[in-house]
Protein backbone atom coordinates (compact mmCIF):
# COMPACT_ATOMS: atom_id res chain seq x y z
CA UNK A 1 0.00 0.00 0.00
CA UNK A 2 1.54 3.33 -1.02
CA UNK A 3 1.97 5.94 1.71
CA UNK A 4 1.68 9.43 0.30
CA UNK A 5 1.92 12.88 1.81
CA UNK A 6 -0.79 15.53 1.46
CA UNK A 7 0.64 16.58 -1.92
CA UNK A 8 0.72 13.03 -3.29
CA UNK A 9 4.44 12.34 -2.94
CA UNK A 10 5.39 8.74 -2.14
CA UNK A 11 7.23 8.33 1.18
CA UNK A 12 7.00 4.61 1.88
CA UNK A 13 4.78 1.57 1.38
CA UNK A 14 3.30 -1.08 3.60
CA UNK A 15 3.80 -4.66 2.47
CA UNK A 16 1.51 -7.42 3.70
CA UNK A 17 2.55 -11.04 3.10
CA UNK A 18 0.31 -14.08 2.67
CA UNK A 19 0.43 -14.70 6.44
CA UNK A 20 -0.85 -11.19 7.14
CA UNK A 21 2.48 -9.92 8.49
CA UNK A 22 2.98 -6.22 7.84
CA UNK A 23 6.15 -4.25 7.29
CA UNK A 24 7.06 -0.86 5.89
CA UNK A 25 9.63 -0.14 3.22
CA UNK A 26 12.43 2.05 4.42
CA UNK A 27 11.41 5.63 4.22
CA UNK A 28 10.15 8.39 6.41
CA UNK A 29 6.50 8.02 7.39
CA UNK A 30 6.20 11.61 8.65
CA UNK A 31 2.85 12.96 7.51
CA UNK A 32 2.23 10.18 4.98
CA UNK A 33 -0.87 7.99 4.88
CA UNK A 34 -2.84 5.62 2.65
CA UNK A 35 -6.13 6.78 1.17
CA UNK A 36 -8.87 4.77 -0.49
CA UNK A 37 -10.12 7.56 -2.77
CA UNK A 38 -9.41 11.13 -3.82
CA UNK A 39 -10.05 13.53 -0.93
CA UNK A 40 -10.31 16.95 -2.59
CA UNK A 41 -14.10 16.99 -3.11
CA UNK A 42 -15.10 14.70 -0.27
CA UNK A 43 -17.93 15.75 2.03
CA UNK A 44 -16.97 13.09 4.59
CA UNK A 45 -13.50 11.67 5.25
CA UNK A 46 -12.95 8.81 7.65
CA UNK A 47 -9.62 8.27 9.35
CA UNK A 48 -8.90 4.70 10.40
CA UNK A 49 -5.99 2.98 12.04
CA UNK A 50 -5.31 0.44 9.29
CA UNK A 51 -5.76 -0.32 5.63
CA UNK A 52 -8.33 -3.14 6.02
CA UNK A 53 -10.69 -0.86 7.93
CA UNK A 54 -10.15 1.97 5.46
CA UNK A 55 -10.93 -0.23 2.46
CA UNK A 56 -13.93 -1.90 4.12
CA UNK A 57 -15.57 1.34 5.23
CA UNK A 58 -15.13 2.88 1.77
CA UNK A 59 -16.56 -0.24 0.12
CA UNK A 60 -19.62 -0.34 2.39
CA UNK A 61 -20.25 3.33 3.21
CA UNK A 62 -18.93 4.96 0.02
CA UNK A 63 -16.81 7.76 1.46
CA UNK A 64 -13.02 8.00 1.32
CA UNK A 65 -11.03 6.79 4.30
CA UNK A 66 -7.44 7.56 5.21
CA UNK A 67 -5.39 4.89 6.98
CA UNK A 68 -3.08 6.48 9.56
CA UNK A 69 -1.15 3.16 9.73
CA UNK A 70 -1.16 2.97 13.54
CA UNK A 71 -3.15 4.39 16.43
CA UNK A 72 -0.23 6.58 17.51
CA UNK A 73 -0.24 8.29 14.11
CA UNK A 74 -3.78 9.62 14.63
CA UNK A 75 -2.16 12.58 16.44
CA UNK A 76 -0.38 13.56 13.22
CA UNK A 77 -2.89 12.56 10.57
CA UNK A 78 -6.22 13.80 12.02
CA UNK A 79 -5.23 17.49 12.31
CA UNK A 80 -3.43 17.31 8.96
CA UNK A 81 -6.52 16.04 7.12
CA UNK A 82 -8.81 18.43 9.01
CA UNK A 83 -6.63 21.41 8.04
CA UNK A 84 -6.29 20.51 4.35
CA UNK A 85 -9.91 19.45 3.77
CA UNK A 86 -12.03 21.98 5.71
CA UNK A 87 -15.08 21.22 3.55
CA UNK A 88 -15.25 17.66 4.85
CA UNK A 89 -16.68 16.19 8.01
CA UNK A 90 -13.83 14.20 9.55
CA UNK A 91 -14.74 11.00 11.43
CA UNK A 92 -12.20 9.01 13.45
CA UNK A 93 -12.91 5.29 12.98
CA UNK A 94 -11.39 3.57 15.99
CA UNK A 95 -10.53 -0.06 16.59
CA UNK A 96 -11.67 -1.74 19.80
CA UNK A 97 -8.99 -2.45 22.35
CA UNK A 98 -5.41 -1.22 22.26
CA UNK A 99 -5.81 1.89 20.07
CA UNK A 100 -9.30 2.90 21.13
CA UNK A 101 -8.27 5.33 23.89
CA UNK A 102 -5.78 7.05 21.58
CA UNK A 103 -8.36 7.40 18.81
CA UNK A 104 -10.98 8.83 21.21
CA UNK A 105 -8.47 11.26 22.67
CA UNK A 106 -7.40 12.56 19.27
CA UNK A 107 -11.00 12.91 18.10
CA UNK A 108 -11.86 14.92 21.21
CA UNK A 109 -8.73 17.06 20.88
CA UNK A 110 -9.61 17.88 17.25
CA UNK A 111 -13.36 18.29 17.85
CA UNK A 112 -14.36 15.56 15.39
CA UNK A 113 -16.66 12.56 15.87
CA UNK A 114 -15.32 9.20 17.03
CA UNK A 115 -17.00 5.89 16.21
CA UNK A 116 -15.95 2.31 16.82
CA UNK A 117 -17.74 -0.99 16.41
CA UNK A 118 -19.04 -2.98 19.35
CA UNK A 119 -19.56 -6.72 19.40
CA UNK A 120 -21.93 -8.90 21.41
CA UNK A 121 -20.76 -12.25 22.77
CA UNK A 122 -22.73 -13.93 19.98
CA UNK A 123 -21.00 -11.80 17.35
CA UNK A 124 -17.59 -12.58 18.83
CA UNK A 125 -18.36 -16.31 18.68
CA UNK A 126 -19.63 -15.98 15.10
CA UNK A 127 -16.51 -14.07 14.07
CA UNK A 128 -14.27 -16.79 15.48
CA UNK A 129 -16.29 -19.42 13.66
CA UNK A 130 -16.31 -17.53 10.34
CA UNK A 131 -12.59 -16.77 10.45
CA UNK A 132 -11.58 -20.11 11.99
CA UNK A 133 -9.40 -18.33 14.53
CA UNK A 134 -9.39 -17.61 18.24
CA UNK A 135 -9.03 -13.89 17.53
CA UNK A 136 -11.77 -11.54 18.66
CA UNK A 137 -13.12 -8.92 16.24
CA UNK A 138 -11.70 -5.43 16.69
CA UNK A 139 -12.46 -3.13 13.76
CA UNK A 140 -15.03 -2.18 11.14
CA UNK A 141 -13.68 -4.78 8.72
CA UNK A 142 -14.45 -7.43 11.34
CA UNK A 143 -17.83 -5.79 12.02
CA UNK A 144 -18.84 -6.03 8.37
CA UNK A 145 -17.74 -9.70 8.29
CA UNK A 146 -19.90 -10.49 11.34
CA UNK A 147 -22.86 -8.63 9.82
CA UNK A 148 -22.51 -10.64 6.59
CA UNK A 149 -21.77 -7.56 4.50
CA UNK A 150 -18.18 -8.59 3.71
CA UNK A 151 -16.75 -12.06 3.66
CA UNK A 152 -13.39 -13.04 5.13
Q: Model regions: which residues?
A:
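TOPRIM fold recognition
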Residues: 43, 55-152
Amino acid sequence: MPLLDIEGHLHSAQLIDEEGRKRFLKGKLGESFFTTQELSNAQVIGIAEGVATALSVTQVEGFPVVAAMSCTRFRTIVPLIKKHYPQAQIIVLGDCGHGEAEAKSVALLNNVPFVSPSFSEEQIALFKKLTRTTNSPTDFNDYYVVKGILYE
